[in-house]
Amino acid sequence: TTSERGHLLWAAACRRYDLIAEFAEEVLRERFLLMTPALDHSHFDSFLRNKALWHDEVAALKESTVAKLRSNVFRMLIEAGLLSENGNIIPAVLSDRVSEMLSARSPSDIRFFPTARGGR
């Protein structure tokens, strides 16, 4: 289905790019679990500032690169059905077969999604 495809593409992006994976787990999922439904650019910027303290390569990013990265991550979240256009986190309703695929890895790739299902 379209929903499954979006979820799998989001998981693939998280697997490929550590920065996106960490944002998904540390910000998107945590905000969902804390029942704080809004997600906006300031959350991404704060996340990057924190990462820049420990990663020189993040600190060296130009503002134009940060803006493009932010824009792409938010567009991907919207296209995956995990974020509304107005910035509200949409709980991931993972199908059984997608959930099985994501759980096959250790730690589970479910950790990249706004869901109460186990992700560790």
Language-model-derived ranges and their functions:
Residues 26, 30, 34, 50-54, ...:
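Amphipathic alpha-helical interaction surfaces
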Residues 2-7:
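Hydrophobic, aromatic-lined core segments that form the binding pocket/scaffold
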Residues 9-11, 15-38:
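Positively charged, polyanion-binding regions of nucleic-acid-associated proteins
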Residues 33-41, 57-61, 88:
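Short acidic alpha-helical/loop segments enriched in Asp/Glu that coordinate divalent cations
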Residues 22-26, 46, 75:
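Contiguous, well-ordered alpha-helical segments that form the cores/surfaces of helical PPI scaffolds
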Residues 59-120:
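Accessory, usually C-terminal, subdomains that scaffold auxiliary metal cofactors
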Residues 14, 18, 38-42, 63-71:
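Short, amphipathic alpha-helical segments
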Residues 40-56:
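DNA-recognition alpha helix
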